[in-house]
Every structure is written in structure tokens, then in C-alpha cells.
Amino acid sequence: MEIRDNNKVNLCFAFDNLRKELSRPYGILFTNNKLFLDFVSKSIQQGFKVITVGDYVSRVLEENGIIPFLEVIDGKTKRSIPQRTIVKNKEYKVTNEAGKIRFEIFEIMENILKDRDGGVVFVNGEEDLLVIPVTLSADNGDIVIYGQPNAGAVVIIVNEMIRWRVRDILEKAVVKEC
């Protein structure tokens, strides 16, 4: 593919061929809210950042007095629109199509996670797969949380092994024009 006179590369990783592989949890699956909230609280006390991907898990933490360092949300829970109660100092907006990750989002997440203030990323489209760039950019020990539909919350403790697994998934993705 040739790109001329275009400052913005409009490419995505597409994951249609990986749906089954991506449907399983890639961390600790919590089905008990008390255990989940205790684990998250202890991680924060130890100085690690909490990053949520998904409206529902973000809201569960907020309702229990835990404010994530970074929230990645699309404004929908199982495609219905929940109310936002917490307003963050820094808000970002990105576009991302369902079943894909735009190349530019990797750099955006890396820059946001380097910032001391965190914030909230509003995704025009779908945020589910943004666990991938967030996990690659988070620090060792940080926790990335996402919802596992009809099961519970999945907590990824970021380390080199999980980054290796994420890179392996990316290598299997197909690069397409967005």
C-alpha cells in the first residue's frame, strides 16, 4: 500500500481471526466483588496504578470509592448508556472501530500513561481491545482491569510475561486500513 501526502496513517490491527483466543480471560478472573475490591485496594496501597478498560468495571470501582488512575470507556455497558458520576481533570478522545485497534492509539496510551495525572479516555467506537495497548504501556506491577461478560472482572498484573503474551497476539492480528 502506498501512502502519499498523508500525515496520518489510517491503519488498524484487526482481530477477526482471533475472536476465540481473545474471549478467554488473560489475568485473574474475580467473580466476587469483595475479593476484587480488596485486591484493587491493596494494589493501590502498594503504589501501583489501576487502569480500567470498560464502563462497568470503572463504575464498580468508583461506586466503592476507588478512582482509577486511567479509565478507558466508550460510554456504553452491554451497549446501553450508563451515567457518569466522576469527572476527571484530564479527558482524552479517541476513535476506534469494533474489533480493531488503530495504530495511533498505541502512542496515545503510552503518552497518557507517562503523565502523572492519568484521566479518562472516551472512545468513539469500541474500547474492548484497548486492553492491549494499555497493557503494553503500563508499568510493571500496575493492574489493568476489564470486564469479562457474564463472568466478572479480569485483573492483569502487568509484567514482562504478560507483555510477551500481548505481543504474541498482536503478531497474529491482521493489518488493515481502518
Swiss-Prot record:
It is an enzyme of class 2 (transferase). GTP binds at residues 55, 57, 74, 76, 127. It catalyses: 3'-dephospho-CoA + GTP = GDP + CoA + H(+). It comes from Saccharolobus islandicus (strain Y.G.57.14 / Yellowstone #1). This is GTP-dependent dephospho-CoA kinase. Belongs to the GTP-dependent DPCK family. Pfam families: DUF359. Catalyzes the GTP-dependent phosphorylation of the 3'-hydroxyl group of dephosphocoenzyme A to form coenzyme A (CoA). Keywords: Coenzyme A biosynthesis, GTP-binding, Kinase, Nucleotide-binding, Transferase.
